[in-house]
Amino acid sequence: MNTLSSKVSEILSELVMLKSTAEDDIKPIVDYVSAKLTRLGLQPRYHNEKGRPAIIAQSGDAGVLLSGHLDTVPHGADWDYEEAETVTGKMYGRGTCDMKGGCTAMLVAAEELVAIDVPFSLCFTTDEETGMKGAEAAAKDRAMKAAPAVLVAEPTNFDIVVREKGLLQLSLRTSGVSAHASMPNLGENAITKMTAILCKLEDLTKVPRDPLANLTMCVDMIRGGTQINVIPSTCEVDIDIRYPAIMSSESVLALLKKRIGKSGYELKILHQLDPVETDPELPAVRTLKEVLGSGAKTITVPYATEMVMFKGHGNAMMVCGAGDPKVCHANDEHIGVSDVARAAKVYVEYCTKMAARTR
């Protein structure tokens, strides 16, 4: 194993062993990253300190900002590999791909960028999986505002994400009247009312021929009833909707209300994120394609990253990193150590080229 791969393997394994789910104490991993940054001569700044903090470190002025999140989803059961176990060049463990691999690449790249005196900034958040409040706070930092490009180091197999679909998560509730199931005429069944509403939305739940370019809708949770012999007085479903940039959350809600009418239910927005779109012909995007070499392509993804929280400053925003998104949150999550090393090299070259072009 060469020196770069050894460095990657050491940092990634240490990050993986520092547990960072929503239930874990986040301080150990924040302290670990802060110490790494301080040893490079950087001075970490903290945002959202009363919650799950975001760390920003800056070297020089107006450099590319690299961003990643240190938190993970829970581990889960039935894994075939131990945490941070490496087999045939792949390291296994929760967070290896999503996205401590990307954070490792950022830290390794930072060491080289400091050595060659290229301006850059880093942002590490700790609540991407549970709300993105840290990213929202970090978006106000001066490094974010000055960056010519923001590059989120999430796993993309080194494709360049320039578009993300919007997210709208809703709670839909119907009410009825409770009664003994032997006398349904005395009650009003909330589940039956919900069934009628969902039938009006059924065609929206069918997967379109091109899911990336169209709205998709999933009914993912349902709650109703208390006992088999009691007419249910309430029924509630949670709905997840992803929509393309040509739509807005307002137009999606209007579409739903047109289908199901304006009464007979309660509708509540649980969470929403706007779609994000970056012009693939921007110089900052073309420069990244240059660095990645032949075969590099820009893509659209159906999910959201913290890129959505960073928009609004006029800088180019992209997602690009090592690892396969399909293994994120899965059992036996893993990432190639050599891929993380390649990502570090890509980030160094990209920051260097962007610095030369913006001087």
Enumerate the language-model features and the residues they cover:
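Acidic/His- and Gly-rich active-site-bordering loop/insert found
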Residues: 1-94, 116
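Metal-dependent amide/peptide-bond hydrolase catalytic core
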Residues: 3, 45-48, 155, 162, ...
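Residue-level signal for inorganic ion chemistry
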Residues: 15, 19, 37, 154, ...
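Acidic-glycine-rich active-site phosphate/pyrophosphate-binding loop
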Residues: 71-87, 146-147, 162-173, 318
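Glycine/serine-rich anion-binding loops at beta->alpha junctions
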Residues: 90-105, 180
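Acidic/histidine-rich catalytic neighborhood of metal-dependent amide-processing enzymes
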Residues: 100-169, 209
